[in-house]
Amino acid sequence: MALLFLNELINYLTYKTSSIMYVDVNRGVDKLKVNIDIDISHIPCDLLSILTSDALGERSTDIKGEITKSRLDKKGKILDTNKYEVKEPNFEKMKLEAKNEEGCNLQGYFFVDAVPGSFLLTSAYYGNIVQRLIMEGDLKINAEHKINQISFGETNNRYDIWSNFGKNIAKLSYSLNNVKKNYEKYTSMYQYYLKIVPTKYITFKNVMNDYQYTYNSYAERGIHEMPSMHFRYDLSPITVEY
């Protein structure tokens, strides 16, 4: 009898995870925070820019957020770190970075409108300089990269989500983490399509809002295209609640 009571008590106290889905008409979020940490092995920092666009027709290189760019030597070691900004090109500096076969790490966050859109990591913004460096034999670039992190929303609750709901659920907020794309001949761009789902986690103590996402990707071939990584995203009208 005591054993039966103990089993019932354990079952009662055990936290069980379940989920529901619904359309959240009161979500009221107008901005989406994008968190990135990406190593781009064969594009120097001074030739790399972030371009954003959305379904409303907004296109910009003026990133709202905090991004750092770290110059990487050809072995991946950090040379220095500076605030990301789009600035007037310094040809001689770009040429030196290209000759040294430098790469770049982009890390931090920026905000976009909470509508379908995309962000592009590319050398196309400095296309004329890139073409000149290639013609002069100083630059060999490609779209090889490693995604250390891409996630959406605030990250301060991630540990609590992991602790309360387990890694199989929590990792859905980091679906692209540690994805690596090695160099493939004639591959100019890697396309990623992300479906972002607003997610709400409810515990006995608090309510935590986050975003999960799934993705598909493919390599786009083109000899004359600028090496780029293109992330297209769409926000689901459905909210998942745990």
Task: Give short role names for the model-derived ranges.
Residues 28-30, 39-224:
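Soluble non-transmembrane domains of integral membrane proteins
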Residues 20-22, 193, 230-232:
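Well-ordered beta-strand positions in beta-sheet-rich domains
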Residues 1-19, 53:
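Internal alpha-helical transmembrane segments
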Residues 11-33:
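Alpha-helical transmembrane signal-anchor/signal-peptide segments
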